[in-house]
Amino acid sequence: MTVAVRVIPCLDVDAGRVVKGVNFQNLRDAGDPVELAATYDAQGADELTFLDVTASTGDRGTMIDVVTRTAEQIFIPLTVGGGVRTVEDVDRLLRAGADKVSVNTAAIARPEVLREMSERFGSQCIVLSVDARTVPDGQPDTPSGWEVTTHGGKRGTGIDAVEWAERGAELGVGEILLNSMDADGTKTGFDLPMIRAVRAAVSIPVIASGGAGAVEHFAPAVQAGADAVLAASVFHFGDLTIGQVKDSLRDAHLVVR
């Protein structure tokens, strides 16, 4: 049985509003998250992802409220990430109505938290979000040539991105959300070599993120090994609809819902 490719709009939420910028900078307002979520559900999105881009510093209460209101409106799986540090954070988001929770910086600081979360809530609930970039010139290379970053791609960790995805799978996460910081917001297409490298290293689903700008960008990401494709600005500002992306995947003889 072939599993259908999932098309996932990503909503970056800052203080209760959807925003989008390049590499998380120059953020412009893209609307109300609950309204946008309902629109994408109606358009045929397979899942939704909310990333709380203020969360690593700010208040969590606003996001809990957004999740609760969204979960009342939509009938597709909702993943929420940003500022998720503890088992308690995961519990709070799942109770508010999230179906999955994505973890990023906290896992870099203490990888074992991934095992604790997946054992408590099940692998299917836990997504490891990997913000990866090409290692900059003048810095020690990693085995794959990509490194994990934090702080919206601004801070390199020196951790090899492919090895980190592999470690996440070993620690029990159910999916890898692979975000290319080199491609993020550029609209020049997904990072296909990075997708291929991570696909070869893990057997769990890989969600490709970063770089979608045109309808023809999506099928190559799936052909490179992505199980799902995630995009933000092309959907929020009306460049593409979910239906157009699914049609392009069908045209490439890929299975979609």
From Swiss-Prot:
Localization, UniProt: Cytoplasm
Entry function: IGPS catalyzes the conversion of PRFAR and glutamine to IGP, AICAR and glutamate. The HisF subunit catalyzes the cyclization activity that produces IGP and AICAR from PRFAR using the ammonia provided by the HisH subunit.
Biological processes per GO annotation: L-histidine biosynthetic process
The organism's taxonomic lineage, starting at the top: Bacteria, Bacillati, Actinomycetota, Actinomycetes, Mycobacteriales
Top EC class, one word: lyase
InterPro entries named among the record's database cross-references: Aldolase_TIM (IPR013785), His_biosynth (IPR006062), HisF (IPR004651), IGPS_HisA/HisF (IPR050064), RibuloseP-bd_barrel (IPR011060)
Active site residues according to the UniProt entry: 12, 131
A GO-annotated cellular component: cytoplasm
Species in which this protein is naturally found: Nocardia farcinica (strain IFM 10152)
Keyword presence, tRNA processing: no
EC identifiers of the protein: 4.3.2.10
Keywords of this entry: Amino-acid biosynthesis, Cytoplasm, Histidine biosynthesis, Lyase
Family note: Belongs to the HisA/HisF family.
HAMAP family from the UniProt entry: HisF
Pathway: Amino-acid biosynthesis; L-histidine biosynthesis; L-histidine from 5-phospho-alpha-D-ribose 1-diphosphate: step 5/9
Gene3D superfamilies in the record: Aldolase class I
GO MF annotation terms: imidazoleglycerol-phosphate synthase activity; lyase activity
Pfam families according to UniProt: His_biosynth (PF00977)
NCBIfam families registered for this protein in UniProt: hisF
Protein name per Swiss-Prot or TrEMBL: Imidazole glycerol phosphate synthase subunit HisF
Catalytically driven reaction(s): 5-[(5-phospho-1-deoxy-D-ribulos-1-ylimino)methylamino]-1-(5-phospho-beta-D-ribosyl)imidazole-4-carboxamide + L-glutamine = D-erythro-1-(imidazol-4-yl)glycerol 3-phosphate + 5-amino-1-(5-phospho-beta-D-ribosyl)imidazole-4-carboxamide + L-glutamate + H(+)
Assembly and oligomerization: Heterodimer of HisH and HisF.
